[in-house]
C-alpha cells in the first residue's frame, strides 16, 4: 500500500516538473522556436483551432519563424491571430507563407521574462511540495488505520522527501538553463 502511494507521488512530481518545463518553453527567448506559437488559436470556419492544426510552423533562421498555411484562404485569419496574440509579433505575408521576424529582446524585457520564469519555477516547486504533503498525509492515514507501523511512516516520509528534493533540483536546473538562454544576446 505504501509503495503505491510512493509511486503515485513520484509520478505526480514528475508531471509537475513536465508542466513547469512546458510553461517555461512558452516564454520567448531571443531565438526562434516553433513552440512559441503553440498557444495561438485561429478562427477556422467559425471554430477556434490551434495554429498547428491549420498551418505548419518551422524555423527559417535563428530569428525568423515561417508559418505555411495549409488552406490559402486562411492566411488572413492566421496573420490576424498572430498579430493579436500577446507575443508582440508582426508577420509578413508572402503567398501561403508567413514570415515572422523575432525582434531582439531589450535588457528590460529580458529581466521581465526572467521574473516570469522564476515565478513559473516557484509554482512548480509549490506543486511538488503539495504532492509531498498529500503523500505524507496518505501514509499517516494508513498509520491511523493500523495498516502500517510508525517505522514504515518514517521510512516513507524520508523516501517522499528524497523524491521531493530530486524533483525540485530538476526544476531548479530547468530554471537555470532558461535564465541562461534568456540572457544570451
From Swiss-Prot:
GO terms for molecular function: ribosomal large subunit binding. Transmembrane segments: none annotated. It is found in: Cytoplasm. Keywords: Cytoplasm, Protein biosynthesis. One of its GO terms (cellular component) is cytosol. GO terms for biological process: cytoplasmic translational termination. The keyword Transferase does not apply. CDD domains: RRF. NCBIfam families: frr. Responsible for the release of ribosomes from messenger RNA at the termination of protein biosynthesis. May increase the efficiency of translation by recycling ribosomes from one round of translation to another. Belongs to the RRF family. This is Ribosome-recycling factor. It comes from Shewanella denitrificans (strain OS217 / ATCC BAA-1090 / DSM 15013). The gene is frr.
